[in-house]
Amino acid sequence: MNGKLPAKSFSRRKKEDKQEWEPLQNQFSAIVLVSIMLASIFSVSFATSSLFKSITIANQGRIGFLKVPITYKSEIRGVFIHEAIYSYPHNWTIIAQTLARYGIDAVFVNDFDIFHRRPDSEITTAINAFHAMGIEYHACMNGIAESYNPDTAAVNYTGGKPDPYAQCPIKVKPYVEAAIRNYIGNHSDVDGIMIDYMRTGVHYCYCDEHRAAFDQWYYENYGEHVSNWTEFYPDQPKWNIYASWRNEPVSELVKIIHDTAKSLKPDIVISEAAWSYFSDCPTYWRKWLGQDTGRWIMEGWIDMVAPMMYVEEIYGKTGETLESCIDACQKYMTGGVEGKIPLLAFTGLCTKNATNFAAHINYIRSRGLDGWIFWRYGGPGVESGGYLTDITPYLEAITMPETFKLGNIQVSASETEATITWTTTLSATSRIEYSISQLFNATWETWGNFPYWRINHIQGNILENLTYTTDHSITLTGLNSKTQYYFRVQSEGPGGTATSETLILTTK
């Protein structure tokens, strides 16, 4: 795969457009964070990392959902609304009504970055309009590759700052936390945060802070300090060592986003617009972009992932095709179909026409993905003079079977048995996967002499009832007493498959 950006690499914002953003640094005093030297990536342990999200049920309990998360739906149908919309007259109510007619259940709105946010009145109007139509509102945050601030810009290995939109992940840490606190503090009804552009470039960052942090890590792991920095520059003998380490400061930002957002709103959904995997290559994004999606999934920092599958061709095991993207993402990123977290395909205008888009959606469904997001909105409610393509012909071309939700999971356990019940909003099958061991793990592997995290599914015991019902009940027998079991429930119907996260029960 070459180093070119995919179709989602937008042009920079227009100068007049920037004036509409509210500077976050003017609203909050900087959050002072104590700088902690980055730990070695090789020290990450399965025992201490969040390989599953769990709710422990001792003996008897109930996992109730005041609000069923979108990750528990049989198919997620989203539309991305790019920041270009703010440059044109637009009506959020008309946009929401339009998308509701086509069965869209979530929008991902590009309304803030590390340093700026759209006016709160604009965001409130948008959230209210979509919520009125039963559509979730996920705020999309531009990360370190698309946030403007010359003062914290990344430094390349020659000492220059050629791109003020490319940020140093160490310098922006307090700004990232402030941005999340500010956004959720002002818009607590937001349903999710999508992390976008959380990646760096080949030549970044070599600022003093990065050099000091890397030097300390290098000393702790190799027993010596850096004596010749040239060896760690791109295409030089030790660049792979630096390239692998530089994922750590970026990953720290994702952890900050997760921890801050969840502390303010525990049920908020954190997602990522990720660089896709092409042609069975699991290291490109980590080596060349500093984007460690596998680590973020392993740690539980993101709840769902949407790789950018901006390709026109569907079939082909190699090259930039939809098939190769899905093959690689399921293989390395989620641990297979109905994997560790929901896997969505970012698609849309890249398909060129409505007929091809319908074919893409049919293929995505046939491969068992958990949904899709259309990039990007144009149509009723936006007067862009044709700049933003009307997507309604695309949406009209696809079939939209009714989707359902899964929730109200309850467990009643004895010494040797456990009965698990749940409900679905439409009739569907019943299935439970359980094991005394974790259902997913992550392994530190190499490809092309470069390391990466791979998510693996360790299949457990399966109990299944193919009878369609909305009230589901399965009893696990032959269990050990006073033992912890990992499990997840799943239901399948005409509208797709809904799967819970990995949960825990404990027998008496």
Language model segments and positions:
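Aromatic-lined substrate-binding rim segments of carbohydrate-active enzymes
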Residues: I95-A96, F108-E146, I241-L264
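Boundary/entry segment of secreted carbohydrate-active catalytic domains
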Residues: N59-I95, L99, A274, C350
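Secretory targeting signatures
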Residues: M1-A58
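Catalytic domains of carbohydrate-active enzymes, especially glycoside hydrolases
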Residues: H90-F115, S188-D189, I302-V305, R367-W372
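Short, surface-exposed linear motifs at loops/turns and structural transition points
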Residues: E402-K508
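Polysaccharide-binding and catalytic clefts of secreted carbohydrate-active enzymes
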Residues: G160-I302, M308-V311, Y315
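Substrate-binding cleft of secreted/luminal carbohydrate-active enzymes
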Residues: W301-L322, C329-P401
